[in-house]
Structures are given as C-alpha cells and as structure tokens.
Amino acid sequence: MINLRKTHPLMKIINQSFIDLPAPSNISAWWNFGSLLGACLIIQILTGFFLAMHYTSDTLTAFSSVAHICRDVNYGWLIRNIHANGASMFFMCLFLHIGRGIYYGSYLYKETWNIGVILLLTVMATAFVGYVLPWGQMSFWGATVITNLLSAIPYIGTTLAEWVWGGFAVDKATLTRFFAFHFILPFIITALALVHLLFLHETGSNNPSGINPDSDKIPFHPYYTIKDALGMTLLLLMLLLLALFSPDSLGDPDNFSPANPLNTPPHIKPEWYFLFAYAILRSIPNKLGGVLALLASILVLLIIPLLHTANQRSMMFRPISQTLFWILTANLITLTWIGGQPVEQPFIIIGQLASILYFLLILVLMPLAGLFENYMLKPKW
C-alpha cells in the first residue's frame, strides 16, 4: 500500500517539511529556536484571540476592559499574563535565533535571511502596536513618542504623523487602528514564516561547522521532532514560571495608571526588547539623525551577507571573529541597559560610545577580522 503521507497533496507538503526532511546530523540546540518561534507565534495568536473577545478598543473603556479581563473573565489573568510575557519569550528566541545566524554564517542563505529580517521588523511593529492597547500611561506616551518620530521626515513628516494618528494627536482613532493592525499582523507574520521556511527548504539547514552536510543527513522525524518537543517543553516551563510567579517583572509600573495626556511620566521607555534600538535613537542629539540611526540599527542586518569576507562560513574555527561576536553581544546588552536609564551623564556618553561600537563592529571590524583570518590561514612557505 502506498503511504498516504507521501501521496496526499496536503500531507505531502507536511511530510517533506517535518517528517522525511533530510537534516544535518550535527545541528546543535541553537537550531531549536526556529521551532520555538513557531510555538511562540501559535501561543500569541491563541491567547490574543481570547483577549480580543473581551477587549474594547476605545479610549474610554480600553483600560477598564483589560482590568475586567484580569478580574472577571475565567482565567483571564492567566491568558493576559501568558500573552504579555509570551512577547518577551518571543523576542528572547528571536534574538538568539538571529545571533545563531550571525555566528554560524546562516545569513549566506540570502533569501531566507532577508525574509527573516522582514519578519523581525513585522514582529517589532506588532509588539509596538500591541503595547499601546492597554491604554496605560506608558502605552499612551510610548505611542506618542514613537509615532512623533515620523514628523522628523522632511517636508511630509507632520502630515504623515497626523495621518497615522487619525487626528492631531494620539487619540481614539489611533487606538482603534492600532488594534486592527495588532489583529492582522500576526497572520502576515504566519505567511512570512511559511515563505521563510520555503526558502530554507530550498537549500536545507546550515550546521555548526559551516561545511556542506549533504554527505551525512538524517530524517527530521523522530530525531529533531523529539528535540524540538524538548525545547518547547522548556520554553513552556519558562513562560509559565514567568507568567505565574512574576508576571509584572518585565512591565513598567506606569502602565498600571490609565493614560493621561496631561501628565507625562518622568522616564518614557519601551519594553525591554526595544531598549537597544531606543538607546541608539537617543544617542544622536538630532531628531532625524536619531530616526535614521534607529532604522539603520535593524536594517544593517540586510547587508551582513555582503560583508562576509572569510573563506570559512561558520565562526566555529575563527577565534578573532568569535571574540568580536561576543563583544557585539555584550555591546547590545549594554545598549539595552542604557535604553532604560534616564538621559543624563554618564549614561549619555556610554550610550553614544556603545552605538558607535555597534556599527563599527558590524560594518568594519568583523569584515576586517574575516580578511585577517584568511591571511593567517594561508600557507607562508
């Protein structure tokens, strides 16, 4: 009898993606984050769906509706805590997934990498509009500060900002459209993730050594299905520990106060996963310059494949590049810390130095290290 999973039009796609897919035999736990991101996306869509049943996107009732979800809806507090902290887990997995791609040279699969960068931007947009929805103080002022950056665009800036707001300031129209965006974007993310997977399966996975693994492949199931299941169990455990024991530890206390346009919080800052970009934005005294640096901090990922100078794909056997990679990691942690600090010395100068180092590492030092490693590997006799 012919196996149904190999002949049925729909089952065949699933089979070729998750069952009979030939996978390198040596991929480490750093390759788990793709499936974990998929799990995060499903968790966020499901919890978000149940939250949307009870949420009202009106400035007068949004804050109260979130309180109602937590107080009166069956397990509403749990659904909301999983959704809020699920976003943090999502970004944690995203950053590790991108870091893995940079370390092991996965960015040389250019189409997969570029779709990945577009996915990152889309997830960031989704998280931003989602943070505005509870209509607390930090929701309102975060939306005001970030959307105001559009006004830095020459000539059309003010018109563009007012068009996004749907008025002359962040108000009811803004909240309503942000809810609409927050509802539709996860489905766009799902579609992009499938395209991401499509391009990945054109080439097959990279592996820690960076060498072509075609000579040694194993089936995805059962080896990597069980490995992914373990990863998902640990992810779920961490998410539940966070959501049940300290659900508000990553949030801002200001967001427990309803939005008030007449009272500005002393320190306006986004969620932790945006702080590195926020620090780069603030490190430039000029408004337009800051916006351009903010965009560049993410879009620089698109040119990483063009800056690959080394003869070896992976950093596994390149100690100088490894050192620079971990300096970049430490630098991003420093930027995240600075983004959460007030705008005063010594934080200003630390932020400016860290911002310069961020671009210097990616655009100059890492390509130079690749060239130097090539030179060192050449026989000298």
Swiss-Prot record:
Alphabetical list of InterPro entries matching this protein: Cyt_b/b6_C, Cyt_b/b6_C_sf, Cyt_b/b6_N, Cytb/b6-like_sf, Cytochrome_b, Cytochrome_b_C_euk/bac, Cytochrome_b_N_euk/bac, Di-haem_cyt_TM
UniProt keywords (A-Z) are: Electron transport, Heme, Iron, Membrane, Metal-binding, Mitochondrion, Mitochondrion inner membrane, Respiratory chain, Transmembrane, Transmembrane helix, Transport, Ubiquinone
Name the PANTHER family on file. CYTOCHROME B
Native organism is Murexechinus melanurus
Transmembrane parts of this sequence: 33-53, 77-98, 113-133, 178-198, 226-246, 288-308, 320-340, 347-367
Any Gene Ontology CC annotation? respiratory chain complex III
- Where is it predominantly found? mitochondrion
Q: What is this protein called?
A: Cytochrome b
- Note the CDD domains from the entry: cytochrome_b_C, Cytochrome_b_N
